[in-house]
Amino acid sequence: MRKILMFLIACVAVSFTASATPSWEINSKGAIQWNVDKAQLPHKDHVEMSGELMAFVLRWAINADGVLDLDRSLVFPMLRTIPNDTHASLMHRLNTDITSMVSVEEKSLYNEATKFVEIDGMFRVVSIFDEAVEVERIIFPSMDKPFMCERYVLKNLQDDEVKVYIPEFKQNITTLPECGVDGSYLISASIQGAGTYKLKSGESLTFDAVFQACRLTEAPQVADVDAEYAARRAFVENDIDSALILATPDQVVNTMFRYAKIRASESIFKTSGGYMHAPGGESYYAAIWANDQAEYVNPFFPYLGYAVGNESAMNSFRHFARFMNDEWKPIPSSIIAEGKDIWNGAGDRGDAAMIAYGASRYALAMGDKTVAKELWPLIEWCLEYCDRKLNDGGVVTSDTDELENRFPSGEANLCTSSLYYDALLSSAYLASELAMNPSVAKDYRKKAETLRRNIDSYFAKEMYEYDTYQYYDGNDLLRSWICIPLTVGIMDRAEGTIEALFSEYLWHKDGLLTQQGTSTYWDRSTLYGLRGVYAAGASDLATEKLKYYSHRRLLEDHVPYAIEAWPEGSQRHLSAESGLYCRVLTEGLFGIRPTGLRSFELKPSLPSEWDAISLYNIKAFGSDFSLNVTRREGGKLEITVTPAGGAVKKYLIRNGQSLKVNL
């Protein structure tokens, strides 16, 4: 059998290297910046940002002359359209050119030369007009109002005084009454800060453009853009930057992790059905899914400790719990329209396994017995549902999987059974924490042991000389989801699986192909794959691919977040994928696996090129603590656990060894 070490060498033939001159760089503030005079033009890209009451996708382009163009796709998830289905958020695109309406010394402020673009929870562009005036744009969503804000700062670069004319401007669009759940909606754009100004040399003035929507029976609001800007900065600096801080020797990985925290946390909407985390992408709002929310992002929020994130996680589980039933009908895949309707168009996708997996991990990581008790009935129901879906081979059947028939998944797929396996183990830990009869935990562990054997006997298969898995019975093409067993601790075929994942059949310049022989990729499987390879102990290979992927997503042609897929959706910045990126580090590199409300297993996988890694201000397990992993002599790792206000604990283990940590 080929060894991982030899495989690393062979990987060179199918690896991809990042550009020697990246379009973007990380500036002194820790933000990503693209200096236009260093880049090849023209260039275009798109980025999504969200607040509680609106989101937008900003499509921006810089032409061959260095001139910026902005196209705003506005989304208002709580202004519902007809039919009131998954995609029924009010949406409208506006290409209004604000600066062209401004005059400087009687000349239209038009065709500025763009100097640089910066993204850091906001979109910032600095340009120069006529070598006389610097124009700074700062674009961001309101955190709690239906506003997209654009702040413009004009600075006089000349020695002489200049006159600046900011016009009064208002643009109103009224939608058709028959198209809205609440009748007509009003979409408006306006300028705040109109007037005629004189700027001496070096002086600046600020004005704002605000894009918003409301019901026709309501009046547009006057935005306090100073307050909105401060609130957005507070979200980034206080909620995101003050917790779960990653420190590795690689600046790109550290920065990508920070950006992933932003995107994973911002896409939460305050609906009539409570806070709902939503994927986004101009399609999926005011709704939840068993995979995106329950499985992907909810288990991440306890580590960050973001209160709105945790509230959205609990709200999603409460919504799913509404559909438990005595007839053992499947829980819907998605609860849509602010909780008022469901979507189950793909049938049973293994949703109960997704929910059990996510809810049990979430309950343990939260470290709150009240939360655990509330979630237990849902977890228990989902486990029983999965048990009732076992086929003659002892694995879980479903109609499809999370890809919803985009690719075949057979009667039973590897993903669903692997998630059920992990949920059984988590639930055994949880049952013990809740002081249930010891037979409950014992029964779940016994079922997990049996399922693990069945997964191997049913799915294990030599595929193209790799000792790995078929995704479903009869599957004869390699699939990216063969990585799933690695993420749940099933290492029986780790070596062959890792070789297959990074072979010429599956590894692509944008990550893992969904299926051998296609050009389709979904970031979710790449991110699961990276986590699984770390869990398997192949830290050098995992780090090589993580660094490549992070550079690709953060600093190259489409930035700055993990994406959904290609070609479907044009690489939308769906939010939960950023949660999966963070979990590559927390659960993969650091190897954190919840085992109790105040305990976890730690199995760091430190690559040979790094001597130390740290994770500061972890909010999980009802605590606030930091982890430091440092290489010592003899191949040992020193683990330092530092609780906030508590006694420091130090351990010495071998690289790849597990450690039980009690807080």
Language-model segments: residues:
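Substrate-binding groove/exosite segments of carbohydrate-active enzymes
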Residues: 237-373, 400-404, 472-488, 502, ...
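Terminal accessory carbohydrate-recognition/targeting modules of carbohydrate-active enzymes
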Residues: 19-255, 305, 538-541, 550, ...
